[in-house]
A protein has these predicted regions:
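Positively charged n-region of N-terminal signal peptides that target proteins for export
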Residues: 1-4
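Compositionally biased, low-complexity intrinsically disordered regions
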Residues: 8-10
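N-terminal signal peptide c-region/cleavage motif recognized by signal peptidases
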Residues: 13-16
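N-terminal secretory signal peptides
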Residues: 18-62
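Compact alpha-helical subdomains of small soluble proteins
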Residues: 43-115
Length: 115
């Protein structure tokens, strides 16, 4: 019985510590990637919006810092590959490719937040 109580207490602590939520500005950036109609280039491969956003969500979750703000997200998660060090680029129809950090900061500015 004692072991069960301890296990339940540990489960409650684990759940409560994992209750960190994604910053609303970061969530908006992920939606922008997903719905923009643009592609993201990662390590030489192109990915449609949904796949790109899913990858960034996974990187964010793996960072262990879901609560990071938009600037931290751009700098630490969404600007480039942690494996190769290569920058991510965004390719939108009819426009020149741009580094993802600049593209994401422009999305922040569109929502009234300087990037």
């Amino acid at each position: 019985m004692r072991a069960l109580v301890i296990a339940l207490l540990l489960a409650v602590v684990a759940v409560s510590s994992g209750a960190e939520t994604i910053d609303p500005a970061v969530a908006a950036l992920l939606r922008a990637v997903e719905t923009s109609g643009c592609q993201m280039e990662r390590n030489g491969e192109l990915h449609e919006g949904k796949a790109a956003a899913d990858h960034l969500r996974l990187k964010l979750e793996r960072s262990g810092r879901l609560g990071m703000n938009a600037d931290q997200f751009i700098d630490r998660v969404a600007s480039g590959s942690t494996v190769s060090g290569k920058p991510y680029r965004v390719l939108c129809p009819g426009r020149a490719p741009v580094d993802s950090g600049a593209w994401l900061r422009a999305r922040l500015a569109e929502h009234g937040r300087p990037g």
